[in-house]
UniProtKB/Swiss-Prot annotation:
GO MF term set: protein-L-isoaspartate (D-aspartate) O-methyltransferase activity
Gene (UniProt): pcm
Catalytic residue positions: S75
Catalysis: reaction(s): [protein]-L-isoaspartate + S-adenosyl-L-methionine = [protein]-L-isoaspartate alpha-methyl ester + S-adenosyl-L-homocysteine
One GO location term (cellular component): cytoplasm
Family recorded in the similarity comment: Belongs to the methyltransferase superfamily. L-isoaspartyl/D-aspartyl protein methyltransferase family.
Name of the protein: Protein-L-isoaspartate O-methyltransferase
Protein purpose: Catalyzes the methyl esterification of L-isoaspartyl residues in peptides and proteins that result from spontaneous decomposition of normal L-aspartyl and L-asparaginyl residues. It plays a role in the repair and/or degradation of damaged proteins.
GO biological process: methylation; protein modification process; protein repair
EC numbers, comma separated: 2.1.1.77
Length: 225
């Protein structure tokens, strides 16, 4: 897969947001075990500094989570890359993201040419993410709703990426996973979470694998404007 992205000159970045700095981040991700070249190319192409507050732009290409308001964060780049790499292994066409947040994970998936549907419970975050998608020329379908419900009208999905942690995998989301599809989600409570990969086999059987220890904000129900 080749990233498809239209960057305006002002989006390219300078200094601590320059392409050179993005390239260094990609090399750190490679050294940390990310192997999929399409994922690395998407991380190199999508300007993470556009998805955070301007005051934090100089930290955009650190391998760390950063605050985006409303008690939420933009995920650590390694985690975004690992989740993306995991779902790409099943060669998906249509992906559901639960928890749009800043829009960065959805943008990475869209840059890979995938058909992306994303759901966010916090209206203000979704409005900002939509502006970023438009600015980058990305056709990401988005919805303001309770992410735990998913978006069943457009299912089933070849891949589902959940960007907030629940104590257990949410049945309503698993039910929207296509045969041969893969769901990647953080599972656990505030003190201990694991990134879990769930794959639905051709016979409908579910196979589960733990990928890594992680720390995510909680997956909450309901909606906020």
């Amino acid at each position: 897969m080749t990233p498809r992205l239209r960057l305006q000159p002002e989006s390219v970045g300078i200094g601590m947001t320059s392409q050179r700095v993005r390239d260094r981040l990609v090399e750190r991700l490679r050294e940390a075990g990310i192997q999929d070249e399409a994922t690395l190319n998407a991380m190199r192409t999508v300007p993470r500094h556009l998805f955070i507050d301007e005051a934090l732009a100089s930290r955009a290409y650190e391998d760390t989570a950063l605050p985006i308001g409303h008690g939420q964060t933009i995920s650590q780049p390694w985690v975004v890359a690992r989740m993306t790499e995991a779902v790409l292994q099943v060669t998906p066409a249509k992906v559901l993201e639960v928890g749009t947040g800043s829009g960065y994970q959805g943008a990475i998936l869209a840059a890979l040419g995938l058909e992306v549907y994303t759901v966010e419970r916090i209206g203000d975050l979704l409005r900002q993410a939509r502006k970023r998608f438009r600015h980058l020329g990305m056709n990401v379908r988005s919805k303001h709703d309770d992410g735990r419900i998913g978006w069943p009208e457009h299912g089933p999905y070849d891949a589902i990426v959940v960007t907030a942690a629940a104590p257990a995998l949410v049945d309503a989301l698993v039910d929207q996973l296509a045969v041969g599809g893969r769901l990647v989600a953080p599972v656990g409570g505030p003190s201990s979470q694991s990134l879990v990969q769930l794959t639905r086999g051709a016979d409908g059987a579910i196979e589960q694998q733990v990928l890594a220890p992680v720390t995510f904000v909680p997956l909450l129900s309901g909606m906020l404007d």
